[in-house]
Amino acid sequence: MTSPFRLIVFDLDGTLVDSRRDIADAANALLVSCGAAPMSEERIGHMVGDGAATLVARALEASGIPRPPDALARYLAMYDERLLNHTRPYDGMPKVLDTLGRRAALAVLTNKPIASTRRILDGLDLARYFPADAVVGGDGPFPRKPDPAALRHLVASATATARSTLMVGDSAIDWRTARAAGTQVCLARYGFGFGSVPLHELASDDRVIAAPAELLEL
């Protein structure tokens, strides 16, 4: 089957992998160490998407706890110990990537730090689907999503065009990134960030899927 896309760019958390529990466990470990009560996994999941520093700030603010100067470093160390405890690819995702990789170039664009991103991709045997230079994290040379600079970089590197590129994500951040870059977008209803998507603002050609396998039908 011929793909209408030359490049397909995936978000990581909530799109390629279900990482909510490990993120929540690390955030709660930080909160408890600061004297706060832990939060529900779902509540912390709603704080994910803008990068680790923002997640830490949101969790501490929601708990009414002043932010310690080393809060981010502590969270990253706690997450590093846990990031593969429960994180797994969404059902069917490896098969989907294998098929899509024969139709188009694949890339990852996440606000997660690049070291954690690569550990997850390597640990779950997903790195083989993405060239090393097509994996962009939130602590590299480009501004974090929803700034479109990193997505535009990936488009140019793949010698694609904006309209031949599909951004796949689960959140309003991914949707705004695609809109700013002029690419097409597919939103993952199964992801834990989908509640942030302004459904009433979606364009007629913005796609929404309920499972990874539906990507093969686009």
PLM region descriptions:
Residues 4, 81-108, 114-118, 148:
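Short, acidic loop-to-helix structural element flanking the phosphoryl-transfer center
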Residues 1-6, 114-218:
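Asp-based, Mg2+/Mn2+-dependent phosphohydrolase catalytic module
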Residues 24, 28, 45, 49-57, ...:
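An amphipathic alpha-helix signature
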Residues 2-46:
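Active-site neighborhood of HAD-like aspartate-dependent phosphohydrolases
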Residues 32-37, 63-67, 125-130, 159-160:
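Short helix-capping segments at alpha-helix termini
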Residues 30-31, 51-65, 120, 154-155:
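Helix-loop "lid/cap" segments that line or gate small-molecule binding pockets
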Residues 57-94:
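Metal-dependent phosphoesterase signature
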